[in-house]
């Protein structure tokens, strides 16, 4: 269940950032909708690059340690993203969060399959069901944003990142 929630939360982070980065850019920098939409492209470009770089790094670094470092950097970067107002810093932090979150799905999925290899079909199906995280987290973000503001909605993603950071240490203990 812990890993299922991890998949749910990492997908929720991806979808949540995809929908809110443009709003964040418009609110903090005064960008137009068409300009701010490029923020999502920046995030997913960083994720793509991070996936390729991660493939090489994961061949040399233990995946639990890699995830711990990634989540630590992602959490710090995301907290800074909530408080900075500069277009340059927002852009840099969007890239940092994209790079550091890029390999989390595959690490969690791999650990889940290794946990009970004799039940890999069931485990795989459960993990893929976690992809619904984008459909669950984003509406909750919307409710929080409407009630308390943009930063409150984004704070839900911070809670997701904190959970992922916590499970990165739990994965190390399972070995």
Model segments located where?
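Paired small-residue
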Residues: 88-96
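A membrane-interface helix-boundary motif in multi-pass transporters
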Residues: 140-161
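Loop-to-transmembrane helix entry/capping segments in MFS-fold secondary transporters
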Residues: 33-37, 117-127, 154
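Intracellular juxtamembrane helix-capping segments at the cytosolic ends
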Residues: 102-117
């Amino acid at each position: 269940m812990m890993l299922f929630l991890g998949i749910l939360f990492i997908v929720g982070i991806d979808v949540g950032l995809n929908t809110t980065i443009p709003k964040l850019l418009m609110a903090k920098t005064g960008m137009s909708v068409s300009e701010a939409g490029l923020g999502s492209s920046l995030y997913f470009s960083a994720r793509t690059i991070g996936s390729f770089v991660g493939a090489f790094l994961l061949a040399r670094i233990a995946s639990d340690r890699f995830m711990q470092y990634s989540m630590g950097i992602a959490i710090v970067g995301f907290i800074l993203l909530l408080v900075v107002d500069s277009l340059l810093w927002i852009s840099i932090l969007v890239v940092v969060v994209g790079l550091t979150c890029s390999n989390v799905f595959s690490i969690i999925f791999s650990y889940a399959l290794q946990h009970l290899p004799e039940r890999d079909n069931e485990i795989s199906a459960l993990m893929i069901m976690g992809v619904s995280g984008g459909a669950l987290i984003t509406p909750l973000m919307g409710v929080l944003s409407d009630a308390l503001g943009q930063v409150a909605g984004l704070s839900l993603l911070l809670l997701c990142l904190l959970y992922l950071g916590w499970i990165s240490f739990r994965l190390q203990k399972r070995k």
